Structure formats: structure tokens, C-alpha cells
Amino acid sequence: EKMNRAKEVAGKEPIFQILPYEHKKVGIVTTGSEVYHGRIQDTFTPVIVDKVTEYGAEIEGHEICDDNPEMIEDAIHDLLRRGCNMILCTGGMSVDPDDRTPLAIKNVTGNVVSYGAPVLPGAMFLLAYTKDGKPIMGLPGCVMYAKRTIFDLVLPRVMADVPVTKADLAKMGAGGLC
């Protein structure tokens, strides 16, 4: 009786699905004057490479940019032209006046799903999609240090070509911690 009721409530939609990960060519844009001018080493990119290659993605390109929105936009456009179907931007994601990555992503896509997520670590996460549906993510610094962040919650969906909405991100806030 309970199983019949469960079937009735579920309707024709599956209760859950297992979707395959799609092959992604990933472009990484590292921003920040400190890295661009060689004052500090880029320690973020190796972390990102490890995370995305776990899903079978390949790194198609990596650009290092100064804190200049036009330079960041050019790097994103260049990676898209080179065939990248996912762009990950590191650096410049906080609220400092010289953090220009969110502006550059907005200018490229015009379609920011969310700048900010109700999940810690990762509150300054940004998700956007290009007009043809390619995801561009702005990753906060915590992704470099914390074992699990909002990026680790979103990445499997993106790798399976499941569009992530603002409502999806809001639902991840139940509990608020990764």
C-alpha cells in the first residue's frame, strides 16, 4: 500500500536519475595582479586541475590576467574560441574594489545565475552561462584551501550538463555547510 502511494505521489517523473558526465574542455582564467606580475605563485590552478580531471575533463587552456576587466574578458573569449565548453575563473571574487572578475564574467555572459551562494565554504561563488549554455564559474579563494566547497556541489551537475539555477543554489543552503 505504501509503495503504491509513493508511485502515485511520484507520478511519471523518476525519483532520481544517474546521468553520465560529459567530456569537458576546461579553460582556466587566473586573475590577480600579484600572480600576473609574478609576486606570488599561482597555487589555485593545480587544485582546480585535480578537481576537474577527476571527472574526465581536460584542460584546454590557462590564462593569467591582471585585475583588469577587459583583459579578463579577452581571456574568456579566447578560451571559448579555442573550444572550451567550461570556464573557471580564480581570483578577484571578493568585495575588494580591485576584484574585477565578477564584472568581466557578467560582461561576457550577460546571464549571471547567481553571485553568492548560501553555502559555506563558498559564499562568494559566481555561476553564469554564455548565450549558448557554456558555464562560467567564478571560484572564491576557499576552493583552494577547503576539501569541499560549493564548487564541489555544483561541479557534478555541470559535468553532467544539468543546468544549475538560482533556485538550485538556494536549496543547497539547507544546513549551509558542505
Each language-model region and where it sits:
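Short, glycine/charged-enriched hinge/interface segments at domain edges or termini
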Residues: 1-60
